[in-house]
Amino acid sequence: MKFTIMSKGDQSSDTLASTMKEYLLDFGFIMDEKEPDIVISVGGDGTLLYAFHRYYNRLDETAFVGVHTGHLGFYADWLPTEVEKLVIAIAKTPFQVVEYPLLEVIIRYVNGSKESQYLAMNEATVKSAEGTLVTEVEIRGEYFETFRGDGLCISTPSGSTAYNKALGGAIIHPSIEAIQIAEMASINNRVFRTVGSPLVLPKHHTCVLKPAAGMNLQITVDHLTMVHQDVKSIQYRVANEKVRFVRFRPFPFWKRVRDSFVADK
C-alpha cells in the first residue's frame, strides 16, 4: 500500500509525521506523494482541507485519515498519543471507508471563456469585492429571489459545522446528500426581501446565482480565495465525487458535534 503524510508544519506535527513515516516504511509500505492510497493528515481540519485539495483529482483511489494536533479536529479522529495504534491499524486491520458528499462549483463568464470548476469539502462563499452583493438566485432552473447583502455561503453536510453554523445554518449529518445555502447579512425592508432562512437542497437540485452586471466577485472554495470578473453565473450542486475517509473504529458524527460545541472541557 502506498501512503503519504501531510503535516501542519509546526514542530510537534512534523515530529509525529516523521515518526509515522518511519513506522510505516518499517512495515513495508511505500511512500508515494503522487499516487497515494492513503493520505495521513497531521494537524487540524485546515491541514486535511489542504490534503483534500491536493488530491482532489484522484478521490476514487485515495482515502484520508487525520491525526489531530490542531485547534479543531472535526475531521481528525486520532490523537498524537495514538500514533502507534494508528500505524498498527493501517498495517494489520482491514479498514472501512466512509464517504462524505462534496460541493461542485461551476463559474461561467459573460465573454464565453472557459468555465472554472471547483470542489469544496466544507463550503464556498460569494461576496462582492466592492460592497453589497446583488444577485438573482435560481433553484432548479426557476427564479427564486434577488439577494442583496454581504454574501452567501453554500456548504456541504460535513462543512455545516463550520462557517455555515456561525451564520445560523443547520447542522446536517454527512449521510444526507445535500447542500445548504445560508445568508450573510441580507438586506430586508419594504423594498427588498429575501427568504431570510437557510435553504437545504437535496441531490440533483441546482442553485444558480446570476450576479448584477459589472460586479467583481470575491469567491472562496474552502481555504482558497479568488476574485472573478465578468461572471455570468455560479452554479452549485451536490458533486458526483465524494471524499473518502479511512475508519478503523467508530467516529460518531453527533458525538463529534457534542464534543466540539457542547461538552465541557
Swiss-Prot record:
Protein's organism: Bacillus cereus (strain ATCC 14579 / DSM 31 / CCUG 7414 / JCM 2152 / NBRC 15305 / NCIMB 9373 / NCTC 2599 / NRRL B-3711)
Cofactor dependency: a divalent metal cation
Taxonomic superkingdom: Bacteria
The name this protein goes by in its record: NAD kinase 1
Compartments where found: Cytoplasm
One Gene Ontology molecular-function label: NAD binding
InterPro entries: ATP-NAD_kinase_N (IPR017438), ATP-NAD_kinase_PpnK-typ_C (IPR017437), NAD/diacylglycerol_kinase_sf (IPR016064), NADK (IPR002504)
SUPFAM superfamilies registered for this protein in UniProt: NAD kinase/diacylglycerol kinase-like
Family: Belongs to the NAD kinase family.
